[in-house]
Curated annotation (Swiss-Prot):
Subcellular localization, as worded in the UniProt entry: Cytoplasm
GO cellular component annotations of the record: cytosol
Swiss-Prot/TrEMBL keywords: Cytoplasm, Methyltransferase, rRNA processing, S-adenosyl-L-methionine, Transferase
Name of the featured protein: Ribosomal RNA small subunit methyltransferase G
Similarity remark: Belongs to the methyltransferase superfamily. RNA methyltransferase RsmG family.
Gene Ontology molecular function: any one: rRNA (guanine-N7-)-methyltransferase activity
Residues covered by region (Disordered): 215-239
Superkingdom, natural source: Bacteria
Lineage: Bacteria, Bacillati, Bacillota, Bacilli, Bacillales
Species of provenance: Staphylococcus saprophyticus subsp. saprophyticus (strain ATCC 15305 / DSM 20229 / NCIMB 8711 / NCTC 7292 / S-41)
Enzyme class, broadest EC rank: transferase
Gene behind this protein: rsmG
């Protein structure tokens, strides 16, 4: 069973799954597949691939950053809940907010959180550009995003939400370093500084991943993020 595989893999990183956590991942998989028949949540539906490329890949974030404290996390464009819901299952201490622009996905996540009996999770139907202008601007310890957009775009969506001294963690494929070179200028404009770039391989030759950790050094200028759609059309690039 794939949950046994996940349990064994995480054990090598010092994470021991309880019976409850194993059941939560099984429920997560079942609901993901059921809801995916009604709406587009993921192109990956084979059980072992979901455990490897969604669950394990999400949790791998914790191998390189300390998530054991009581932290506030905002996950931008999480889709079916990755990486924040697998991380919340492992680290119940996290206070998680997911922002997604599609109301159907928010409905799925609400049902999922109820089925998994998760507390301190909230789901917001909004564009990141709008959410980053509101009351929760500069209020999160960590803001994360996985496979949402290029880093030059993501930085403008995510860094305004990070509190000073917090981190924006971008989870990318093997092309993350290429994206980083393009995004460095905008990261600086938005008050960030690249702290680390970590490359690692998924098990079973499932591919390389890169985790880019950006420190929030100063407050983001008030004009950012720009209106919805603008960061994607005109990313902050050095001229």
């Amino acid at each position: 069973m794939s949950v046994a595989w996940l349990t064994q893999q995480l054990s090598t990183h010092g994470i021991e799954l309880s019976d409850k956590q194993q059941q939560q991942f099984q429920t997560y998989y079942q609901m993901l597949v059921e809801w995916n028949e009604k709406m587009n949540l993921t192109s990956i539906t084979e059980e072992h691939e979901v455990y490897l490329k969604h669950f394990y890949d999400s949790i791998a974030t914790s191998f390189y950053t300390d998530l054991t404290k009581e932290l506030t996390i905002c996950d931008v464009g999480a889709g079916a809940g990755f990486p924040s819901i697998p991380l919340k299952i492992i680290f119940p201490n996290l206070k998680v907010t997911i922002v997604d622009s599609l109301n159907k996905r928010i409905h799925f996540l609400n049902q999922l959180a109820e089925a998994l009996e998760l507390d301190n999770v909230s789901f917001v139907h909004d564009r990141a550009e709008t959410y980053g202008k509101g009351d929760y601007r500069a209020s999160y310890d960590i803001v994360t995003a996985r496979a949402v957009a290029r880093l030059s775009v993501l930085s403008e969506l995510c860094l305004p939400l990070v509190k000073k001294g917090g981190h924006f963690i971008a989870l990318k494929s093997s092309k993350g370093e290429e994206e980083l070179e393009e995004a460095r200028f905008g990261i600086g404009v938005l008050g960030g500084k690249v702290l680390d770039t970590i490359s690692y391989e998924l098990p079973e030759d499932a591919g390389e991943r890169q985790m880019i950790i950006i420190d929030k050094r100063s407050q983001t200028p008030k004009k950012y993020p720009r209106k919805p759609g603008t960061p994607n059309k005109s990313p902050l690039l050095e001229k």
